[in-house]
């Protein structure tokens, strides 16, 4: 099973999601996009290093296609963000070119580090890399990936990225991140996500979630699209 499939299977364990309260802060919209296919994806090995591998020729096609897809809906973005990893920045570039501004790099959008499991086969990730994230989704956020982060540390840094986007003044932002990071954070924090559906059809390269909300009152799923096929 691929890392994408394993992450999806783990998310079914996360059944209790954060419900929004009466809004006390203005809401914004954030579209979280998974990066296009990278050389790491194509290799079948876990690669969470920074800056990490580039996207493949197929990945470039996917990056172009998701830009057309998002802009084709008549959506006008006023902010663009990417992680510290080159594959998200390359995926963001066609959108950045269309917007006429470079992506702002946010460390909190980076992939969950594999720690001691870096470079191991993706097929084994369910018994290695994803053991701790499975515990996060079951409520134990103190579980740590050996040589990497625990659930509280991961959640805090992604929260900080979302806070930075909110504080920027952008009201319709697009942010490029990573499969495990997006799916895990969304399952932990976003109202309206169906873990069973996500488990059966995990986020593909250039798949995305559109969220509405704010860091104080919480986030709600507006729509999702598993773009790359």
Regions found by a protein language model. Give the residues of each.
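Domain-level recognition of soluble alpha/beta enzyme cores
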Residues: 193-220
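Phosphate-handling substructures
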Residues: 54, 96-159
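Secretory targeting and sorting signals
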Residues: 1-24
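Glycine-rich phosphate-binding loop signature in dinucleotide/nucleotide-binding domains
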Residues: 73-76, 165-171
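Short beta-strand scaffold positions
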Residues: 82-83, 156, 176-177
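Active-site-proximal alpha-helix that buttresses catalytic centers in soluble enzyme cores
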Residues: 25-105, 152
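Generic beta-sheet signal
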Residues: 30, 171-179
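Short, solvent-exposed aromatic-acidic interface loops
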Residues: 222-229
């Amino acid at each position: 099973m691929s890392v994408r499939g394993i992450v999806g299977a783990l998310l079914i364990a996360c059944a209790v999601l954060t419900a929004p309260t009466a809004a006390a802060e203005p809401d914004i919209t954030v579209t979280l996009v998974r990066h296009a296919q990278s050389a790491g994806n194509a290799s079948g090995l876990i690669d969470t290093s920074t800056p990490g591998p580039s996207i493949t020729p197929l990945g470039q096609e996917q990056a172009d296609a998701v830009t057309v897809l998002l802009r084709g809906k008549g959506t006008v973005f006023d902010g663009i963000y990417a992680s510290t990893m080159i594959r998200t920045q390359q995926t963001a570039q066609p959108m950045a070119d269309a917007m006429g501004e470079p992506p702002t790099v946010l460390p909190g959008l980076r992939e969950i580090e594999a720690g001691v499991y870096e470079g191991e086969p993706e097929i084994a990730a369910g018994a290695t890399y994803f053991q701790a994230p499975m515990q996060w989704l079951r409520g134990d956020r103190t579980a740590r990936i050996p040589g990497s982060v625990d659930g509280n540390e991961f959640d805090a840094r992604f929260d900080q990225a979302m806070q930075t986007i909110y504080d920027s003044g952008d009201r319709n932002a697009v942010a490029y991140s990573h499969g495990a990071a997006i799916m895990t954070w969304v399952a932990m924090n976003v109202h309206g996500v169906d873990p069973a559906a996500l488990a059966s059809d995990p986020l593909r390269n250039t798949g995305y979630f559109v969220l509405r909300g704010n860091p104080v009152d919480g986030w709600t799923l507006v729509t999702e699209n598993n773009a790359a096929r």
